[in-house]
Design a protein with these regions (language model features):
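Thiol-based oxidoreductase modules, predominantly thioredoxin-like and allied folds used
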Residues: 122-139, 150-161
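Non-globular targeting/processing and membrane-anchoring segments
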Residues: 2-121, 125, 143-145, 157-242
Length: 242
């Protein structure tokens, strides 16, 4: 994206807005300020681009109706997929990597859920949210207690029916993020992340756009960036942390 030099849709050019910036910090060089204002123009363009993509996402036509009301197991017992909506019309559901074959939960998924646990009380004002994995519910409840995920709703998909339908048809233990809508009693698929590992750019791990994990977004603000070989761990105090 290059900063606009002409107005688009009534918006002032990003380069013009950046040029009007009066912010300065102690002892900064002219070289720094020139580079920072150039970056500011790109940040303005990025903000606008993100909104255009979000608007395009919101404008998606109705997705397919779910083929069946999946049977899951919640903390209080068996339940149907549709019940996860509660009194909301939109449901976000994250499928984490914690299948039966895994001895420990995925550290990256755990890092993501640590962020969700903090904001879910606000998100639930707008939509319903749940986390699923192909592990017994007792195992998920124990994981929830250990990590202090008191705000998150966990459900077990031991049969794999939901996971095969909307996450991975090959029964592989991979993460997934999907959004469903309920209108006039009908539950439809609205959105799922489709950026696969094959679509990753050289030198980068697969990632969504925008990245749903604020951990990586915050590291992008640092001089070191995300790093080439650093990943979250379950426990930084012991060696058994992967």
């Amino acid at each position: 994206m290059s900063p606009s030099t002409t107005e688009v849709g009534g918006l002032s050019p990003a380069s013009q807005l950046a040029a009007s910036n009066t912010v300065h910090f102690p002892n900064e060089s002219a070289e720094y300020r020139t580079a920072r204002n150039a970056l500011l123009a790109e940040e303005i363009e990025l903000r606008r681009y993100l909104e255009r993509v979000a608007a395009q996402r919101r404008a998606l036509p109705p997705g397919g109706e779910i083929p069946r009301d999946f049977e899951l197991v919640g903390e209080a017992g068996p339940l149907r997929f549709s019940s996860l909506f509660g009194d909301k019309n939109t449901l976000m559901i994250y499928s984490m990597m914690y299948g039966q074959a895994r001895k420990t939960p995925c550290p990256s998924c755990t890092s993501f859920l640590e962020a969700w646990n903090g904001i879910v009380v606000n998100l639930r004002e707008r939509c319903a949210i749940a986390v699923t994995a192909r592990s017994p519910i007792d195992r998920l409840i124990e994981y929830k207690k250990q990590r202090g995920f008191n705000n998150l709703l966990f459900v077990s998909d031991m049969s794999g029916d939901y996971t095969r339908t909307y996450v991975n048809p090959k029964d592989e233990d991979v993460p997934g993020f999907s959004v469903f809508s309920r209108r006039d009693g009908t539950v439809r698929h609205f959105y799922s992340g489709e950026l696969s590992g094959a679509m990753a750019d050289p030198g980068q791990d697969p990632r969504g756009a925008p990245d749903l994990n604020p951990l990586w977004t915050m590291l992008d603000f640092t001089p070191e960036g995300r790093g080439a070989d650093w990943y979250p761990k379950l426990d930084y105090k012991t060696q058994n942390s992967k």
